[in-house]
UniProtKB/Swiss-Prot annotation:
Enzyme class, spelled out: ligase
Family annotation (InterPro entries): ATP-grasp, ATP-grasp_RimK-type, ATP_grasp_subdomain_1, RimK, Rimk_N, Rp_bS6_RimK/Lys_biosynth_LsyX
Name of the protein: Probable alpha-L-glutamate ligase 2
Gene that encodes it: rimK2
Ligand binding (Mg(2+) 2): 260, 262
Organism: Pseudoalteromonas atlantica (strain T6c / ATCC BAA-1087)
PROSITE patterns linked to this entry: ATP_GRASP
Keyword Calcium attached: no
Amino acid sequence: MKIAILSRNQNLYSTKRLKEAGESLGHEVDVIDTLHCYMDISSNRPAVRFKGEALPYYDAIIPRIGASVTFYGTAVVRQFEMMGTFSINESVAISRSRDKLRSMQLLSRKGIGMPRTGFARQPDRIDDLIKNVGGAPVVIKLLEGTQGIGVVLADTQKAAESIIEAFMGLNANILVQEYIKEAGGADIRCLVVGGKVVAAMKRQAAAGEFRSNLHRGGSASLVRLSPQERKTAIDAAKTMGLNMCGVDILRSNNGPVVMEVNSSPGLEGIETATGKDVASMIIEFIVKNAKPNNTKTRGKG
């Protein structure tokens, strides 16, 4: 099988592991810089070009697209879909998951547990926005933030109002969420592949920090999931339409709540914490499911 990994950096842990796993299972795996691709979209034979020539036909692609290049990256994925190539995550699903607000609206519609959340840009009653999610302390997030950037914990009503006013001054879209104190600065990352949780780890925030992202100094350890947590992760992935993703869950007094669904989860932390060969599981899923035009939208949506 011929597989392409769409990644801007072939030396990243996740990219290297996926390439190694694919090759060890006997497949041909290329790493292609998404931003250096360009597309022929006007002819009746759609193509993706790279370094002066049309790329060969690939049986499957694995998009490893960073948040900052979502627009162009998903356009490249869509072009591959139009050519009949199987993508482990479809362009529409990636775009859907990258929009935090749309993701939460979809999860809410499916009745999946979430923290109480408000969305605003220029609210005329900041106090009511805060009150509506249960009052301070609250977590305030920039809608476009990633890896814990643009996420602030406001301990008091006054602090929350000041932070929201500051973000309003930037004309930013913001989410205001209840603070799940009982989680103790920890969350659970569930790695879902093909409708199954194949690995899970607990991420604990560093001392004095409430964000558990490993990029922010958090630590990772093995965790045992409850049946409800496992079901929540699987349901969240299904709602987003993602075959492979990381689902971040907090343990609240009301059961598991989903914080985020990540369409391009890093593999280093979870493989190290669990000792599982997640990269090979991803390749094996592709081998079983990659058939020409085996995407729901075929690049149309």
